[in-house]
């Protein structure tokens, strides 16, 4: 299904690229662990709130910006289980929302299937294209850093990016081997989107 020609897309100055199945799984793990810890029910993560937090962690500051959110998922997965809104085709793809402080966020979702182009390969291809696009100033990537070699391959791609004007941030659940990019912890944005406050987990 990967008929996307990433070279012909008009990219925004800010681009978030995420393995959506992975962030959905991490959100589930956080819900299970924190419900036990704080002894209350936790609602699914707010997709808009999560995207705003990722953009802030990626260096975006207040202003009338445009940010693209690229959600890459397995074709079999029709909807996210631990985020709202959830359904890729009906609720997320080609949708947009406006944040009072950071401007417009435009969401696209792309289903992938292994026999065509695998999800990791597709994510790396999008990341490579975006990082080589002059107009893009900030790139935030959330690969599956726990299974497979997507993170290491991404590090290798980013090593070759020669653009001092670009701010590239990779997100993972724990500090990972560094490279030609910044690192942030994925858990903070997810906890915020799940409505878990720092006070509750002291």
For the regions a language model picked out, list residue spans one by one.
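Cofactor-binding loop segments of dinucleotide-utilizing enzymes, especially the Rossmann-like FAD-
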Residues: 74, 144, 173-175
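A charged nuclease-like catalytic/ligand-binding cleft shared by nucleic-acid processing domains
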Residues: 11-15, 20-25, 32, 36-140, ...
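Single, functionally critical "micro-switch" positions that shape active/binding sites
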Residues: 2, 18, 145
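Short, surface-exposed basic-aromatic patches at helix termini and helix-loop junctions that form
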Residues: 129-134, 155-167
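Acidic, polar low-complexity linker/tail segments
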Residues: 1-12
